[in-house]
């Protein structure tokens, strides 16, 4: 628990007011309170009514929320209560609520929670309000709101104390509401296509399913080291072996790697697997997910993002990795070449060759990352990744140097990774062993051998198309946000 700091004057006054409430027989931390309306329901129902129409209707309502503004003196006061949907004004008169209730109002501080019952009305200025008949104290805020309660400007505080950001910054609040809606719509889309949502282990004996550095922990009772999952892939494909045919999982994965504007150590992915499908079917599925979210959540195909217009409508561009490199960098990897020839090309083009690079495929990937990625602004499926960097993908039938894999790039960043899954257990074991060798040579993103998964494949897995989407980046795109910390309620902080 954080150390309790010395109370400042405001905090002392608030504690005194809490004591005064106790002395008056009022619980400063109240109990259940039943509302008839939230602020949005009131505005939607009555904003178009005139002051006279509302007076004639003589409607009453019960609202509750956090006190955000308060003004007035003498026997009349105005205030604004804030709930999840917005704000509603309060009009409080001493002769309407009585002395005891008016004292509650007068002594309430900004940040306190109140319940209010009263008449739905409009002021002379035309603002929809609740004319209070009864006030109920619901919770005392012992700390004041941030000084600029209309919006925190200190980003460090916004991330560390997200609750203050949500109270004071409606744009931030709405962004997280949008995130929830996006996730709900992805679920709706997948469920509607016959996929089963499943849950797989977060703790694993071996971290697999991706090239990434895992977090390790120790299970005391079993006395074994375990890894937090870096992907959900291998367990989901075991379910395809088991006959579930169409599965998906939305969940957290963990990678012990660097942090930047688009990377956080724990993040959310959606992975799906479909028996009897291939990577081209999964391209269609991926397009469908993005377009469904565009239609149902933001209501448009053209998104303003990072100073650019991104169009997620229609068919996404599809290009082979080798063709993309040839187009941008002018280097042609279609002709067969030796590793030495590829290394020479790399040096000519200022590409560093790592010690664990053992094939032309590694160098092709480096060319792509250095020269092509940042040029892919509009949604683009890049397919045909080299076998060496795709240990779980099926080899291409026509050219076994490459795999039936794609990545979706938007604005120079990867948004999805998918492939026709490798279902040959002998080939899979060989690729796992090659990864283990790369790990020994210093590639800390390479994985070890998952013998249990190989055994599952030996029981037979049908041809399968698999997909992984980074949910946080997807939310960034659809909310126009350039930092991943702005779409994570509680980002990792030092």
Swiss-Prot record:
It is found in: Cytoplasm. Mg(2+) 1 binds at residues 407, 414. Its EC number is 6.1.1.6. InterPro entries: Aa-tRNA-synt_II (IPR004364), aa-tRNA-synth_II (IPR006195), aa-tRNA-synth_II/BPL/LPL (IPR045864), Lys-tRNA-ligase_II (IPR002313), Lys-tRNA-ligase_II_N (IPR044136), Lys-tRNA-synth_II_C (IPR018149), NA-bd_OB-fold (IPR012340), NA-bd_OB_tRNA (IPR004365). GO terms for biological process: lysyl-tRNA aminoacylation. It comes from the Bacteria. Its main location: cytoplasm. GO terms for molecular function: ATP binding; catalytic activity, acting on a protein; lysine-tRNA ligase activity; magnesium ion binding; transferase activity; tRNA binding. It holds the Pfam family tRNA-synt_2. Keywords: Aminoacyl-tRNA synthetase, ATP-binding, Cytoplasm, Ligase, Magnesium, Metal-binding, Nucleotide-binding, Protein biosynthesis. Mg(2+) 2 binds at residue 414. It catalyses: tRNA(Lys) + L-lysine + ATP = L-lysyl-tRNA(Lys) + AMP + diphosphate. Its cofactor is Mg(2+). Binds 3 Mg(2+) ions per subunit. One of its GO terms (cellular component) is cytosol. Belongs to the class-II aminoacyl-tRNA synthetase family. Homodimer. NCBIfam families: lysS_bact, PRK00484.1. HAMAP family: Lys_tRNA_synth_class2. This is Lysine--tRNA ligase. It comes from Lactococcus lactis subsp. cremoris (strain SK11). The gene is lysS.
